[in-house]
């Protein structure tokens, strides 16, 4: 590359001896000078241009390769992230289902416990009602019995005279006496 640059510098400072030389005045140049300059540029510039284009091509290819590697790495990371997301979603669904089933289980247990408590309360209420009914019936029986006894005593006291009273006592004494003799 240095040789090419030195050649251009050498041609640019070539002494003009009259017949052949490089004319730097573009308006004063002729077709032959232009052809020579273009030919030299093509001959020497072809290698330089090829080197520049090859370097540029290599950089572009290198950039493309790096981009492809980055893209592949990004795709792999994306796939890993998707897999993790699916796993987390499955775990979340599992926790949600376990939570719902736990809630349903607790609900069923609470309903069962409440049902049992209600049954016990109903049984206790029925027993209390039965005992209260029995007590009320016993009180009514007792009052009826007391009234009957008082009525009978009243009737007996009004109907009994002294003679009937003595006769009843003698009959009872004779019954008791007969019982004593048998034993």
From Swiss-Prot:
Membrane topology of this protein: Single-pass membrane protein
Stretches that traverse the bilayer: 27-49
Keyword Transmembrane: yes
Keywords linked to the UniProt accession: ATP synthesis, ATP-binding, CF(0), Chloroplast, Hydrogen ion transport, Ion transport, Membrane, Nucleotide-binding, Plastid, Thylakoid, Transmembrane, Transmembrane helix, Transport
Any one of the GO CC terms: chloroplast thylakoid membrane
Superkingdom, natural source: Eukaryota
Major localisation: plastid
GO MF: ATP binding; proton-transporting ATP synthase activity, rotational mechanism
Subcellular location: Plastid, Chloroplast thylakoid membrane
General function of this protein: F(1)F(0) ATP synthase produces ATP from ADP in the presence of a proton or sodium gradient. F-type ATPases consist of two structural domains, F(1) containing the extramembraneous catalytic core and F(0) containing the membrane proton channel, linked together by a central stalk and a peripheral stalk. During catalysis, ATP synthesis in the catalytic domain of F(1) is coupled via a rotary mechanism of the central stalk subunits to proton translocation. Component of the F(0) channel, it forms part of the peripheral stalk, linking F(1) to F(0).
HAMAP family: ATP_synth_b_bprime (MF_01398)
Note: In plastids the F-type ATPase is also known as CF(1)CF(0).
Binding partners and assembly: F-type ATPases have 2 components, F(1) - the catalytic core - and F(0) - the membrane proton channel. F(1) has five subunits: alpha(3), beta(3), gamma(1), delta(1), epsilon(1). F(0) has four main subunits: a(1), b(1), b'(1) and c(10-14). The alpha and beta chains form an alternating ring which encloses part of the gamma chain. F(1) is attached to F(0) by a central stalk formed by the gamma and epsilon chains, while a peripheral stalk is formed by the delta, b and b' chains.
Cross-referenced PANTHER family: ATP SYNTHASE SUBUNIT B, CHLOROPLASTIC
Family: Belongs to the ATPase B chain family.
Protein name listed in UniProt: ATP synthase subunit b, chloroplastic
Organism annotation: Oryza sativa subsp. indica (Rice)
Gene this chain is encoded by: atpF
């Amino acid at each position: 590359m240095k040789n090419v640059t030195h050649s251009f510098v050498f041609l640019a400072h070539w002494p003009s001896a009259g017949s052949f030389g490089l004319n730097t005045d573009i308006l004063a140049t002729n077709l032959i000078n232009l052809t020579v300059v273009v030919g030299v540029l093509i001959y020497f510039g072809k290698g330089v241009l090829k080197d520049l284009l090859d370097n540029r091509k290599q950089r572009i290819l290198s950039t493309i390769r790096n981009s492809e590697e980055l893209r592949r790495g990004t795709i792999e990371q994306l796939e890993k992230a998707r897999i993790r997301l699916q796993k987390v979603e499955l775990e979340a669904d599992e926790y949600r289902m376990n939570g719902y089933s736990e809630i349903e289980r607790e609900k069923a247990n609470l309903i069962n416990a409440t049902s049992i408590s209600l049954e016990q309360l109903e049984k206790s209420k029925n027993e209390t009602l039965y005992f209260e009914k029995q007590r009320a019936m016993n009180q009514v029986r007792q009052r009826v019995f007391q009234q009957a006894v008082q009525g009978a005593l009243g009737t007996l006291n009004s109907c009994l005279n002294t003679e009937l009273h003595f006769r009843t006592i003698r009959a009872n004494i004779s019954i008791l006496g007969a019982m004593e003799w048998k034993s």
